[in-house]
Amino acid sequence: MESKPMKILIIEDDIVDCNNFINCIKQRKDVELVAVTDSDVDGLKYVKTKQPEGIVLDLELNNSKSGNTDSFEFLANLKKLKLNYEPIVIVTTHVNSKRT
C-alpha cells in the first residue's frame, strides 16, 4: 500500500527562491505542493483549508498583508489556530539577511 504524499505549503516572497523550492518538490513523489503564497495572511488561510503537514516559511516577508514582515508573528498566529495536528515548519532566509 502506497502512503499519501506529505502536503507542503510555501510562504516565500522571493520568486527565485520560491521557484527553487517548487522545482525540488516537483521532483519528489512523496511530497505534494498544495499552495504557494507570498503573504502571511494568505498562508494562514491555506493552513486552514489545505492542512499542510509541512510549511516552508521565509523569515522576512516583504509582501506581508498584515504589515508585519517578521514571520514569528505568523508562527504565533499559527499556534492560535489550535490545529489538531502540528505542521513541520522550515524557516528560510538569505545569508545577507539582517536576521542572520
Where do the protein language model's features map onto the residues?
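Acidic, metal-coordinating helix/loop segments flanking the phosphotransfer/catalytic sites
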Residues: 22, 36-54, 61-62
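A short, hydrophobic beta-strand element within the central beta-sheet of small alpha/beta folds
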Residues: 76, 85-100
